[in-house]
Amino acid sequence: MVAQEQLVLLLMLLAGCRGGANAILDPGWVIPSKVEQLIGGDFNLSCTLNEDYFNGKSAEDCPVEKLYFTGGGRVYRDSKHIRILNNTTILFSDTNAVEQENDYHCMCDEYVINKSKVYVGTRPLLVRDFNCLDYDFQFMVCNFTQPPNTVITKYNISYNTNNDWRYSNTLDCNFDSAPVVTCNLTDDNYKRFSETFYFRLSISNALGHETQPITINHFERLVPARPGQNLTLLNRTESSVCLSWEMPRRSNYNRGLVWQVRVTPQNFEPITRPSWRNHTLTIKDTLCLTELPFAGYNYTLRVRVRANQNNTLWSEPMIYAFATAPAPPRRPPRVTYGSFYVYSSEKAMRFYWEPLEEHELNGPDFRYSISEYRINGTAVDPGLIKVESNSAMIDHWSMSAVHHFLIRSSNSQGLSVNATPMTIGPISNRDFKVREPRNIRSVYHPTNKSYTLSWDPPSDQRELQNYTVFWCVPKPGLQSECEGSIRFAEVASGLHHFTTSPDQLLTLHMAVSANYQSHNTGLHWAICSSDKKDDLAKMEPSIDVATSTSLTVSWSERVCAVILAGYNLTYCQRSAGRPDNCTTVTIDRYTNKHVIQNLVPYTDYSVKMLMYSDSRVSKYSDELVNRTGEAAPSQPRELQLIRVTSDSVELAWKPPLLANGVVRAYEGTFRSLHDNVTDTFRVSASADELVNNEKPITYRLGNLTAFTKYEISVRARTVYPSEPSNVILFSTAIGVPSPPQLYVINNPDQSSRLDWEPPRTPAGRIDFYEISLRDNNASCLTSTILPGRNLSYVMATPRCTSHNPFQLAVRAINVEQHPQLNGADAAEGAVLLMSTNGKGCEARTDALGEEERLQFEAYAANMTAYRLYRSDWGIYGFICTPDTHSVKAMYQTIEVTVAILVLGVIFYLVYKKYRKMSDIGLVLPQGIMETMKKPIDMGGLGLGLGPDSSVSGGIVCTRVDDSPPYTPQDLPHDFSSCGSESSKLLLRTASSSGGGGCVDRDGYDDNHETGPISAVGPPTSYLAMRHGLLVQNDRERERERDREQEREREQQQQQRESEMDREQSCTNGYIKPTQMKSWGGNGPSDNDHTFSVPSTAMTAPMSQPLSQIPLSGYVPVPIPQSRFNPAPVQPFGSPAVPSAATAAAASTFFPPAHLLNMDNYVQASDLHKLKPLVAAPLSQTGGPAFAGSSPATSPPLQLPPVHAASPAAATPKMADIGYTTMEQLQLTGLIKPPLAATVGSPTHAAGGAPGGGNQHSRLQPQINGYVTPQDLNAMAHNRHVL
């Protein structure tokens, strides 16, 4: 008991360990999972529930009390087999186990917890049929059958050839076709020439182990290869053939070989000859088959061979088909006395012979021929005789003549040597009367399938020698002709019957002839099946044709009709498998067919027959059972209506009383009385109707037209349709009409005339029409109810535009009264009424008469008693009144859309160009770099930039011109945009001019002698500055903050001045530099806004206030087309002003002023896009041109006097690059006129005297982002003062 508890605990422990691994997959475990036990032994199985699997489930899902086992077709629940160990485990025990191989399942109710495979069998059993075969010394195959055992058994086979098991080899076996095991021995260890093989079978399973030794005589198990390799036919004659073939491994058989030769003629038994020996050579074998019986005949040769040793095995046979050489037929056909037949016309005769057998034909193209034909000894052409395979026919036969024939056989090799003579003597009418057998009859014996022919002797038996009996297979419908061979036998004159051999065909034609010494009337065919004295045979009728009401029965004649009194035919209607209501009919003896009439369709009938004579009655034939065909059923009954709706009707009827077959379907026909259209429907029949034909059949016919009269009937159909049922008439209910077709005519007085056609499908009386005016979203604006008789209406329509179109719509309304609505009808009515609501407005009824209005209000107010069916809207598109610009508006919309798309694309391309140009860096030309290395004295600026300054840099060339007035309000300050276009343009300027621009500047700045000015435009001046001026320092940042504070104080004044400037001029433009650096200086001065500039052209220094001007903001801009350069600086001359021609030339060079107005911001990088105009020719003399110029054409600000260099310099120089200079802005009117504060300055026309001791008023632009033309003029003015 302790040991058992320990075993249970061990099993539980194993179950717990296994459950930890499979807790997710298995609801429990069965241990062990496989059991192998001896028959009669005991075994135990434990089943443990997996508690983790049942977590979260109710405890009653599978308690341990519900566990049980099933296996081997049994259920184990009792305490004898099941014992509960704990709250999760049970133990199953089985004693005295029987042989089995089953799955045992641990079950909880109908669910499987787990299973175990149980094998109960025996220890290993010894093999009984181990055998090996060696195939022509090539390989060995061994096989055996595993003894039956339910316990899995393994087999290991080893072998050797000297019985020394220290050295053995393993045999490779295939168990796929178990229980038959096949082992192959084909490796290099195969000892082909060893006589003995020793095998050892090691057999083991879970119940034991066995070793079985087996010894095989190798040579006795040899199987030679099939002979016939490279078979050759050496010779062939009419009775022999010689063959030759190879056998390569003949030398391996030391004791020689034994041959077996069998020759089988076609359709004969095999024949053997002791002389048929195999002439064996070293490699080839030669066999000659002699004394073969048939020429030109087919034979089959079978040759096999075995080793010349006892108990050896035969090889596979060589099978060879051959034919002997053909030869002429050996004999003619046989004939007998009386083997001819005289036709009833007595003018044609056919004579018969016995054909040769197939093996006697001796070759192809076999036939029979008449080699000689004589009539009364006179030779006649044999071609007059029609020769067939077993007979010949003479059409013009004479009964009084003697006919003599010679019959031969022939084939492709020629005629037979011998001929069969046949002579037919004259026949008289008396011979036909007294010398022919009488009452010829035959009896068929079905037991052995034989026939017996009987006859009565002729009236005249004198000189009667014997009888000849003939039999053959008759041709269909021809009693006097045979199909195939005719056989005959002689019968003694004292016998009057003949029985054929057994196993004859069912239809056999027999005849007999009476042979006299000098007379013969030929053969006479039997026409009777039996004799009176014989027992009447059981008939074998057959049912040939079955219709719905008749059966046609036929039978064959077994006896002559003259011996019969008639036939009895009995037929019975079968119910419940038994005959019932039988009827017997008597049939005339000369009849072989009868039709049974007036039968019930689709009913089983049994038929049997017998024949009777005056003295006998035959046994009834075997009963034939047949079923009549199907017929049309009776009509369906009691067709009636159950429910009618607007589009359907529910019908009911009862099945027909007489099905007369299988009712497959019901076919209904319904006709609309409105348009006389007929349609059909089909309802499949069910099997329940065969059981209960009183149960009504219901069908719902849909897709009907509302408010229409119909007539309907139903037919039942088997194979044929029945008569129609009763016809019923009904009308469908009122329904939803189809939408009217609306036409609208727009009137000029903002009204529209609506005309519509009635609904094609009114589905009712059309009580009302509803007219609706709706907006673009199909929302109702107005709705009007009209009487159902109205088909037109004029209504006011509002004026609409393309942004506010509207629709006109009309729909029909039917009203149906339903005093009681319940169930599905009420629900359907609610749906119909609710479907009419939507985005709408309240319908107006003022167009109705008083009575009609009250009716409509009553209908609408009482939805439970009335049902309103509204059709879909008949809509007349979107209209406008008037609608003359709809097409134009559409085109305008398209144009605006296209314009927006084009502008978007242009903006995107400009933005990409701007981004690309803003990334260009400043690279100065080499010439400018060299100039920047020279020391330049700028100490006069008061900025600490003298010759000794350590700040190095380049020079920026700019054009100097009189400064125009400006106001700070004109400047939208913005320095956030950076770019390098100016550097690129500066590089182009330097490279194109070769640095000449700065040379001109030096000539202008260093030679301030007075002299006349040429007629060219104002000269170009330059402002030289160090590269360090472009660098911003801390002091500059402080000044920036000061400027911001000052800007706030002057904001109000700037606004007022900006308004004045806008009134004076509207041509101010803005030039956004691509890059601006802050202005820098050495340090603060006493007055941040003033500094003194010495001038070589004046006797006293002039001091003017100057704002912090970022000189780097004025950038060179390329001119796409060349323009005139200013004249070179003259060393002497008097002050002058630009001439009118100069101003005109400058004004014609630039584009119109509207390109740079207050609303047109232009970046500096875009100035090169301004196309220059054609320049006017300039005057070559300065004085007259100046004198001739009027004050109106003089610029508002004038430059200091300059000197002409030489007369030759008056010729303008063409250049392909220029600068955006102040005179360009002035002459085009882009700058503002000078303010009052600047009038009287030395640069003004009125104050241009040399007495320039007066202080010039310095323009102070607030440069914070954008540069205006005024700012650039101020820069030029300050440079000139310097």
UniProtKB/Swiss-Prot annotation:
Tissue: In stage 11 embryos, tracheal pits show highest expression, at stage 14 high expression is detected in the posterior spiracles, gut and head.
Keyword Lipoprotein: no
Principal localisation: membrane
Residue ranges annotated as Cytoplasmic topological domain: 911-1282
Post-translational modification: Undergoes lysosomal degradation.
Cellular component annotations (GO), alphabetically ordered: apical plasma membrane; apicolateral plasma membrane; plasma membrane
Subcellular localization(s) per the UniProt record: Apicolateral cell membrane
SUPFAM superfamilies, A to Z: Fibronectin type III
Positions with biased composition (Basic and acidic residues): 999-1009, 1033-1064
Residues spanning the membrane: 890-910
Membrane topology qualifier: Single-pass type I membrane protein
Phosphoserine: residues bearing it: S976
GO function term, MF aspect, one: protein tyrosine kinase binding
RNA-binding found in the keyword field: no
Region named Disordered: 989-1092, 1238-1258
Residue intervals annotated with topology Extracellular: 24-889
Domain of life: Eukaryota
Position of the signal peptide: 1-23
GO biological process, one term: wing disc morphogenesis
Known role: Critical for epithelial morphogenesis during oogenesis; border cell migration. Required in the germarium for the polarization of follicle cells during encapsulation of germline cells. Required for embryonic segmentation and trachea specification. Essential receptor molecule for upd and JAK/STAT signaling during oogenesis.
Subunit structure: Interacts with wdp; the interaction promotes internalization of dome and its subsequent lysosomal degradation; thereby reducing JAK/STAT signaling.
Similarity comment: Belongs to the type I cytokine receptor family.
Protein name (database record): Cytokine receptor
